């Protein structure tokens, strides 16, 4: 397996797109071949590398150019307050990144907020997307079975508003099914990321007031998506309800759904080996 590190793959690029002028986006890049852009979730301290370091090596070895993008207002990318729903604004930033790097088309892999970003990109820029891979994406409105917002989202906003090590631990306990994966190394790494950028936390809450989660819902437009789509979900997800996966399956013309048992909101991390195998097979053969 290719040995990669965060520092050896770390890069910056300035993007110019609606709402972004000479805006610094940080990303990690490795490999050659068709481009796969991986989009992280929206929890405090999230970033491309921390979300996908268990996936980048196998995808590079499979012959792909992999880009792990820090979304605007996260990790090492510039700070921002958003006046529109975050999935749409983030999708514009993905286009800006692709334009700056001369990438005509890319496959998108999106988890949670990153899934909402990928959905919006597929809707706004259908000629620029290859295949679409979603893991528990946000932006799909109410649930048939679960009260909204779910337990994990409530903890996420609590952590944004009152960041503490204990609240972070509580959120990760809801985030992951397998509690043995919540190591001191994982907790400390995420806590350090949260403390590094206090402005990002404040701006996220301001943005959420301007464009709350209810504005993210793109369910009515899912039928417009023409990209081949692979949906994955954790059966035990306590952030985004499993029935949202059925919404996607019912409404996207060319879609398939895989549900991982004993899995929370981070399928690509909790079940990395199986996730990598399934998605690489989808990219190669679907």
From Swiss-Prot:
Sites annotated Transition state stabilizer: 112
MF GO annotations: 2,6-dioxo-6-phenylhexa-3-enoate hydrolase activity; 2-hydroxy-6-oxonona-2,4-dienedioate hydrolase activity; monoacylglycerol lipase activity
Substitution effect: residue 265 to A: Unable to catalyze the tautomerisation of HOPDA. Extremely low hydrolase activity
Alphabetic keyword roster: Aromatic hydrocarbons catabolism, Hydrolase
Involved pathway(s): Xenobiotic degradation; biphenyl degradation; 2-hydroxy-2,4-pentadienoate and benzoate from biphenyl: step 4/4
Annotated binding of substrate, by residue: 42-43, 51, 111, 180, 190, 266
Function: Catalyzes an unusual C-C bond hydrolysis of 2-hydroxy-6-oxo-6-phenylhexa-2,4-dienoic acid (HOPDA) to produce benzoic acid and 2-hydroxy-2,4-pentadienoic acid (HPD).
Family membership: Belongs to the AB hydrolase superfamily. BphD family.
Record protein name field: 2-hydroxy-6-oxo-6-phenylhexa-2,4-dienoate hydrolase
Source organism of the structure: Paraburkholderia xenovorans (strain LB400)
């Amino acid at each position: 397996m290719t040995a990669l590190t965060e520092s050896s793959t770390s890069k910056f690029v300035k993007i110019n797109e609606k709402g972004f002028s000479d805006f610094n986006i940080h990303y990690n890049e490795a490999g050659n071949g068709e481009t796969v852009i991986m989009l992280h979730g929206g929890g405090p301290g999230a970033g491309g590398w921390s979300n996908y370091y268990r996936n980048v090596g196998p995808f590079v070895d499979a012959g792909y150019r992999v880009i792990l993008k820090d979304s605007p207002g996260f990790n090492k990318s510039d700070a921002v307050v958003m006046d529109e729903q975050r999935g749409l604004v983030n999708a514009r930033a993905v286009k800006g990144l692709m334009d700056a790097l001369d990438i005509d088309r890319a496959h998108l892999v999106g988890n949670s907020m990153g899934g909402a970003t990928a959905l919006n990109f597929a809707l706004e820029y259908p000629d620029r997307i290859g295949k679409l891979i979603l893991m528990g994406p946000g932006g799909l409105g109410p649930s048939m079975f679960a009260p909204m917002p779910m337990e994990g989202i409530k903890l996420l906003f609590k952590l944004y508003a009152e960041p503490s090590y204990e609240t972070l631990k509580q959120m990760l306990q809801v985030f992951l099914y397998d509690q043995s994966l919540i190591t001191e190394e994982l907790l400390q790494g995420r806590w350090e990321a949260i403390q590094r950028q206090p402005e990002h936390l404040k701006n996220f809450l301001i943005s959420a007031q301007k464009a709350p989660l209810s504005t993210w819902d793109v369910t009515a437009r899912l039928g417009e998506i023409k990209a081949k789509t692979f949906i994955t979900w954790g059966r035990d997800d306590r952030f985004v309800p499993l029935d949202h996966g059925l919404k996607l399956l019912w409404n996207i013309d060319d879609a398939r759904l895989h549900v991982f048992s004993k899995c929370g909101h981070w399928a690509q991390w909790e079940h990395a080996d199986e996730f990598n195998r399934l998605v690489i097979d989808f990219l190669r053969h679907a």
